Swiss-Prot record:
This is Large ribosomal subunit protein L37-2. Its cofactor is Zn(2+). Pfam families: Ribosomal_L37e. Binds to the 23S rRNA. The gene is RpL37-2.
Length: 89
């Protein structure tokens, strides 16, 4: 039995499939655990030794639907609803 390149050609079973949380092909089928995000754990997998990877997923890398409007709203006193005040000349 050889142990080098030739034995790699015999591999045809999938160990990982797509993770439903992070979308990467890192979900281990037998372990039922994602090696990328740690699913089904409640907290997302992240370590300090991979600071670059943390930055790729951190706040500010996505759409920021709520946060990108918050600063403008805060400057105006977090007003909501109501009609605009009429200007009197």
């Amino acid at each position: 039995m050889t142990k080098g390149t030739t034995s790699f050609g015999k591999r045809h079973n999938k160990t990982h499939t797509i993770c439903r949380r992070c979308g990467n092909s890192s979900y281990h089928l037998q372990k039922s655990k994602c090696s990328q995000c740690g699913y089904p754990a409640a907290k997302t997998r992240s370590f300090n030794w991979s600071r670059k990877a943390k930055g790729r997923k951190a706040q500010g890398t996505g759409r920021m639907r709520y946060l990108k409007n918050l600063r403008r709203r805060f400057r105006n006193g977090l007003r909501e609803g109501g009609a605009a005040k009429k200007k009197t000349n």
